[in-house]
């Protein structure tokens, strides 16, 4: 009996020591919808609001809108090609050099969300992205 308990203990130890796979925070099934409390902080200000992402057949559509319902950012993420397309940006951010940085950072943020990490910090431009999953935010 004692040998049996020792073998179970050793087996459990090895199972618990295996690296665990982080759960993706992106929508995974067709039509799945995920909502985040989103904050983008820059030196000159910040954007905050709700980000909704919906999984389509080949891409993930995302929209970031503020507390007043004004859409600040619409984008499409193509996971198979690792590309971001900005579909709509508010006037304040609608400059080629800002959109270039935004696309690069959103792509990195999507990679982080896929690994279960909900933040990204751009060291060069000092921009912080925080996407916190809202409770009961996943709909299928």
What are these language model-derived features?
Residues 1-5:
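Positively charged n-region of N-terminal signal peptides that target proteins for export
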Residues 7-17:
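Bacterial N-terminal signal peptides
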Residues 17-24:
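Boundary at the C-terminal end of the N-terminal hydrophobic targeting segment
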Residues 24, 37-39, 70, 79-140:
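Mature, soluble, non-transmembrane domains
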Residues 26-42:
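A short, Trp-centered hydrophobic/proline-enriched beta-strand micro-motif
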Residues 32-35, 57-58, 114-116:
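A short, compositionally biased
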Residues 44-46, 124:
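Residue-level detection of beta-strand-connecting loop/turn positions
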Residues 48-80:
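N-terminal, post-signal-peptide region of Sec/Tat-exported proteins
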């Amino acid at each position: 009996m004692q040998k049996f308990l020792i073998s179970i203990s050793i087996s459990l130890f090895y199972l618990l020591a295996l690296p665990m796979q982080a759960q993706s925070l992106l929508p995974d099934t067709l039509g799945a919808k995920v909502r985040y409390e989103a904050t983008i902080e820059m030196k000159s200000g910040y954007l905050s609001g709700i980000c909704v992402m919906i999984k389509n057949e080949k891409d993930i559509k995302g929209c970031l809108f503020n507390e007043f319902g004004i859409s600040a950012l619409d984008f499409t993420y193509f996971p198979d090609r690792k590309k971001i397309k900005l579909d709509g940006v508010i006037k304040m951010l609608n400059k080629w050099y800002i959109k270039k940085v935004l696309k690069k950072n959103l792509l990195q943020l999507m990679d982080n969300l896929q690994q279960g990490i909900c933040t990204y910090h751009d060291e060069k431009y000092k921009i912080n992205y925080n996407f916190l999953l809202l409770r009961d935010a996943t709909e299928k």
